[in-house]
């Protein structure tokens, strides 16, 4: 009987246990439905999203346990939701958040709505008190949204909050701490990356009595700061004020009285002076960042008391002269030390016998005038990152660092004077190695890839390596970035490398002596997005293997000996943004269709035939100079983005089409050295040449989908220090344009619109057969820096409107048929450095003053009617010559008058004699009879002769 009872009890327990376990199988139904409503909210703001692609585990399946969904955490016992994140990688429309959507999550403790494109909060029922419904909410992350100060009244109702992050929003003006006075439990407040300015009301911080961590970095200008009030934050352990600009001196002693500080971030706050002695009193300090200031002097001895210090950064300050690291000797917990100078004015002095007690994880001594590897590194065994770039270290590359530090991941030695590369004796797991810009010569090590097979980034450019490309490089299966440009390497690329490095994303081998056919067969470079092999000796046609690299974004094969036609397939790669095939032997006709978005360089080849009407497409920079192209400039269709159109040195004929005037984003237009005729279109003033509104100016961004190499080596409360490689700096555009009587290179960065290229605006129509007048409308292009109309048949006058070209630096109108005087108003062109009007028919006085006083007589040759400096022709002599010419004209007029008198006097004499004869005949009859007989005799004689 007892056995049956016992068995029954066990059965009941099993049933209860099964029922209990069944309760764990699913989340709360109300919360599951609420999560699906949140997903609908996200979907409503994403036009291109499909339902299954956004938060795909959040499904309508009733059997699906929402506690197992992504971005969700639940209590193991109650199955209530405790953690929620709405993060998605999709681009969402900006929207308000209705807080009532969150009310079903009554037990939620952590709410992450960062990166959600939210710009405000709303609740039509409970208003500002809405968040009080979430009575257990402790962590609220609203970072990287579009919120402004209007959300503070809502936040004040979340009285249980301990952590509040409003990083990277649109907060502005003074910090409205009074509106957060009910958040008495708040321990961490992050307001970094906003636009907070004005005064910092430190006196209001006592509302937040439990505050331990405060981040106000990267905001703006604090016009005033109640510095002394910081001392009242007695519980504060973490303070970040980095990258703000404070008016007036900073009383650094205030920080010295905050005895509980463990992390202090004062980067980039314009801190001037020496390192404070009193910092040595902060014996709890673990993290201290004073980089990017104007600190001088040396590390004070009091720093030796910072027994808890793990992280110290003093980089980018104004230290000069000798700099000693001796005060750091006894800091046994120091893991990260970062030091670099701004302008190589400091010399770090490290005694050969110095043996500190710490074991570093990260050491950066960049631009410190070091002449040898510090000896203390011989005793470091836990290094992960070493950066000794920009020094004067010579001799052998210190590969013993790899042998002593098996966990070393990053070794930066660029821009030194190393001469010998010696490989480690055993295989190492190093991931980043940069020894570029040294003086290393000799053969490149054959076993390089076998000893360092795990390299992700390798840069050995700008050295003197010789010999062939090592076949062992094919064993670096993880390599993503490889740069051996600017060396003397030769031969062909080994097949083992071409067929094995499928992770390679960036390959740069330019400025070497590599030869042979490039990629004649298919390769395994399936991840390649940047390929630069320019300035080598490659020959033959463009290889079949190259045409399989469909993910390429940047391809530079310029200045080789490639021949044959341009494969049309190459110009329709989906992601290709930059293609440079200039300086080769390519020939044939241009393809009719191009899908490139940005840059196409085909100059200095042998292309023939016309330019297709559809050739431009979405290209922003097109360079076809110095080919053998013929025909008219086409009526380009379906193009709006062209900014640089360079067609110099071909055999183009016909008129300049007026459709060019529709290129409203034009910056450089070079049609010189062709056979164009007709007039210069007066509509050229429609071309922007820098006149476009700011938002219309093109950003020459080449999208490279390669993630930067990232290695986090220290994480504090607010600052995550890391080693990062940014590859965008490798990509630049170089455009040559004739100005100031020479060809200059104008450089532009792809991503950031930096460099001289983005400030250059020019028009070159020289060496053609253009005729007619110079349109006055060209004077409206007041951003032009270079204008060249020389070697044409232009006539009439120099337009007075050219005086509006305020930024013009080079103006060349030589070898035309221009007449009249040089407009005096041109002396107001204060930027003008080159002015040439030689070999025209100009006359009058040469203007003087300002920039015109700098031009020599070569600017005016071949204009005999011009006078004044800098020519030898005096305007006074010219005036006398003109007066003499005027005197001759008066003599001619007098001669003309004398002849007129002669003619009139002769006629008068004849008439007078005739009248006298008639009078005598009337008075004397004998005279009349004699006259009549004479007339009759004359008539009779005439008749007889006629008979």
From Swiss-Prot:
Subcellular location, record wording: Cell membrane
GO CC term, one of those recorded: plasma membrane
Membrane topology according to the record: Single-pass type I membrane protein
Chain ranges on the Cytoplasmic side, renumbered to this chain: 921-947
UniProt-listed PANTHER family: RECEPTOR-LIKE PROTEIN 14, RECEPTOR-LIKE PROTEIN 8-RELATED
Regions that span the bilayer: 900-920
Keyword presence, Transmembrane helix: yes
Intervals holding LRR repeats: 105-128, 134-157, 159-182, 183-207, 209-232, 233-257, 259-281, 282-305, 307-330, 332-356, 357-380, 381-404, 405-427, 428-450, 452-476, 477-500, 502-527, 529-549, 550-575, 577-598, 600-616, 617-640, 642-663, 664-686, 757-780, 781-804, 805-829, 831-854
Signal peptide segment: 1-27
UniProt main location, coarse: membrane
Family in the record: Belongs to the RLP family.
Protein name: Receptor-like protein 56
Extracellular side: 28-899
Classification via SMART domains: LRR_SD22, LRR_TYP
Glycosylated sites: 60, 75, 98, 141, 148, 182, 232, 330, 415, 459, 478, 488, 524, 606, 686, 788, 828, 836, 841
Keyword annotations of the record: Cell membrane, Glycoprotein, Leucine-rich repeat, Membrane, Receptor, Repeat, Signal, Transmembrane, Transmembrane helix
Domain of life per record: Eukaryota
């Amino acid at each position: 009987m007892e056995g049956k009872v016992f068995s029954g009890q066990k059965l009941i327990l099993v049933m209860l246990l099964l029922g209990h376990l069944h309760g764990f199988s699913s989340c709360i139904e109300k919360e599951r439905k609420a999560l699906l409503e949140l997903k609908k909210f996200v979907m409503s703001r994403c036009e291109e999203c499909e339902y299954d692609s956004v938060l795909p585990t959040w499904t309508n399946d009733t059997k699906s346990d929402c506690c197992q969904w992504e971005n969700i955490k639940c209590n193991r016992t109650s199955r209530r939701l405790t953690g929620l994140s709405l993060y998605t990688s999709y681009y969402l429309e900006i929207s308000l958040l209705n807080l009532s959507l969150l009310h079903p999550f009554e037990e939620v403790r952590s709410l992450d709505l960062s990166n959600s494109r939210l710009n405000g909060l709303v609740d039509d029922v409970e208003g500002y008190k809405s968040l009080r419904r979430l009575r257990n909410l402790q962590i609220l992350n609203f970072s990287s949204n579009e919120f402004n100060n209007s959300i503070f009244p809502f936040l004040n109702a979340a009285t249980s909050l301990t952590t509040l992050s409003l990083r990277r929003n649109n907060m502005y003006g003074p910090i409205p701490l009074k509106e957060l006075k009910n958040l008495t439990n708040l321990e961490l407040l992050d307001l970094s990356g906003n636009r907070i300015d004005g005064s910092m009301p430190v006196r209001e911080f006592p509302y937040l009595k439990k505050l331990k961590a405060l981040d106000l970095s990267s905001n703006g200008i604090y016009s005033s700061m109640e510095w002394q009030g910081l001392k009242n934050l007695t519980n504060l352990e973490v303070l970040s004020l980095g990258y703000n600009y404070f008016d007036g001196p900073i009383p650094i002693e205030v920080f010295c009285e905050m005895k509980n500080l463990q992390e202090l971030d004062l980067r980039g706050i314009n801190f001037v002076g020496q390192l404070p002695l009193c910092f040595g009193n902060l014996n709890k300090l673990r993290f201290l960042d004073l980089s990017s200031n104007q600190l001088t002097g040396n590390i004070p001895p009091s720093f030796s008391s910072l027994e808890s210090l793990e992280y110290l950064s003093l980089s980018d300050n104004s230290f000069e002269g000798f700099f000693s690291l001796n005060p750091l000797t006894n800091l046994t917990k120091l893991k990260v030390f970062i030091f670099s100078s701004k302008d190589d004015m400091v010399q770090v002095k490290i005694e050969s016998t110095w043996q500190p007690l710490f074991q570093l994880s990260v050491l950066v001594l960049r631009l410190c005038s070091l002449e040898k590897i510090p000896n203390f590194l011989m005793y470091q065994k836990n290094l992960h990152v070493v950066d000794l770039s920009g020094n004067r270290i010579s001799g052998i590359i210190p590969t013993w660092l790899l042998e002593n530090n098996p966990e070393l991941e990053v070794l930066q030695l660029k821009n030194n004077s190393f001469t010998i590369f010696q490989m480690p004796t055993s295989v190492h797991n190093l991931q980043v190695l940069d020894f570029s810009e040294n003086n290393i010569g000799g053969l490149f090590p054959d076993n390089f890839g076998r000893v360092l097979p795990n390299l992700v980034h390798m840069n050995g450019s700008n050295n003197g390596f010789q010999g062939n490309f090592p076949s062992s490089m094919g064993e670096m299966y993880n390599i993503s970035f490889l740069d051996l440009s600017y060396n003397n390497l030769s031969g062909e690329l080994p097949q083992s490398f071409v067929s094995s490095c499928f992770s390679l994303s960036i390959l740069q081998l330019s400025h070497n002596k590599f030869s042979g056919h490039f990629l004649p067969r298919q390769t395994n470079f399936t991840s390649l997005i940047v390929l630069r092999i320019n300035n080598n000796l490659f020959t033959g046609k463009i290889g079949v293997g190259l045409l399989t690299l469909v993910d390429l974004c940047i391809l530079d094969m310029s200045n080789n000996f490639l021949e044959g036609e341009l494969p049309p397939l190459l110009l329709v790669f989906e992601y290709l943004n930059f293609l440079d095939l200039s300086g080769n032997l390519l020939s044939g006709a241009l393809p009719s269709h191009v899908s490139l978005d940005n840059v196409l360089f085909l100059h200095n080849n042998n292309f023939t035939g016309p330019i297709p009407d559809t050739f431009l497409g979405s290209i922003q920079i097109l360079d076809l100079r110095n080919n053998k192209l013929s025909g008219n400039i086409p009526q380009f269709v379906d193009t709006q983005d062209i900014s640089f159109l360079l067609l110099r040195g071909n055999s183009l004929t016909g008129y300049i089409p007026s459709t060019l005037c529709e290129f409203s984003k034009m910056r450089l237009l070079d049609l010189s050295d062709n056979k164009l005729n007709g007039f210069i279109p007066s509509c050229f003033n429609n071309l922007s040449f820098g006149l476009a509104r700011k938002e219309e100016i093109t950003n020459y961004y080449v999208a490279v989908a390669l993630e930067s190499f990232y290695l986090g080596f220290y994480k504090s409360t607010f600052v995550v220090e890391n080693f990062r490689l940014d590859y965008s700096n490798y990509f630049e555009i170089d455009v040559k344009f004739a100005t100031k009587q020479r060809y200059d290179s104008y450089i532009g960065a792809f991503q950031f619109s930096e460099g001289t290229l983005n400030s250059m605006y020019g028009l070159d129509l020289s060496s053609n057969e253009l005729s007619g007048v110079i349109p006055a409308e060209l004077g409206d292009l007041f951003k032009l820096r270079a204008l060249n109309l020389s070697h044409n048949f232009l006539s009439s006058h120099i337009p007075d409107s050219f005086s509006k070209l305020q930024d013009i630096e080079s103006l060349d109108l030589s070898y035309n048929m221009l007449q009249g005087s040089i407009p005096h108003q041109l002396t107001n062109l204060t930027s003008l450095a080159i002015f040439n009007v030689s070999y025209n028919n100009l006359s009058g006085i040469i203007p003087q003053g300002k920039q015109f006083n700098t031009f020599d007589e070569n600017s005016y040759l071949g204009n005999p009617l011009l006078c004044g400096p800098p020519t030898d022709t005096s305007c006074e002599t010219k005036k006398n010559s003109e007066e003499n010419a005027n005197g001759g004209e008066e003599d001619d007029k007098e001669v003309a008058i004398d002849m007129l008198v002669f003619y009139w006097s002769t006629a008068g004499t004849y008439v007078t004699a005739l009248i006298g004869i008639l009078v005598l005949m009337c008075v004397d009859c004998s005279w009349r009879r004699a006259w009549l007989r004479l007339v009759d005799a004359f008539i009779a004689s005439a008749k007889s002769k006629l008979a």
